[in-house]
Amino acid sequence: MAESIQSLDQLSQLKGAVTAPDAPKYEKKVDKFGRAYATGKRKDAVARVWIKPGSGKVTVNTRDIEVYFARPVLRMMIQQPLVAAARNGQYDVICTVAGGGLSGQAGAVRHGLSKALTNFEPELRGVLKKGGFLTRDSRVVERKKYGKAKARRSFQFSKR
């Protein structure tokens, strides 16, 4: 094999042809209603997300996204995976989210939406992975320590 390669051009052509036989092959996962499902997590929030082809309507806990997430920044955050994949307005999103605050819930919906998109269209996995949408944000609140006012803040010090 190594003897047959004479130049770098041949090597670059060979690179695309050779893939590992055990490389994971992602396939479309939809239920009997034609919906893709995924769960997303962020801080203390957990979101269950279903997507189906539609007009782009987003429903959170049976309420419209404009009602549930009043801040435009949170709505934009949820739409990011669809915009990155150039699928904005092509899917209806239904999700239930519980726990945490609004920012954590928006992050959980975004994470779940990204995973559901890859279940519906596995070819989008590379784009979403590159954008960092499929990675679980593991940052959580640091616990309070005894002998301290908060996690790191010490009590006020007095010399005398």
Swiss-Prot record:
Q: Which GO terms describe its molecular function?
A: RNA binding; structural constituent of ribosome
User: Does the record's keyword annotation contain Membrane?
Assistant: no
Return the SUPFAM superfamilies for the record. Answer: Ribosomal protein S5 domain 2-like
PROSITE patterns tied to this protein: RIBOSOMAL_S9
Q: Does the keyword Ribosomal protein apply?
A: yes
Q: Which positions carry the signal peptide feature in this UniProt record?
A: none
Set out the biological process GO terms recorded for this chain's protein: translation
The name on file for this protein is Small ribosomal subunit protein uS9
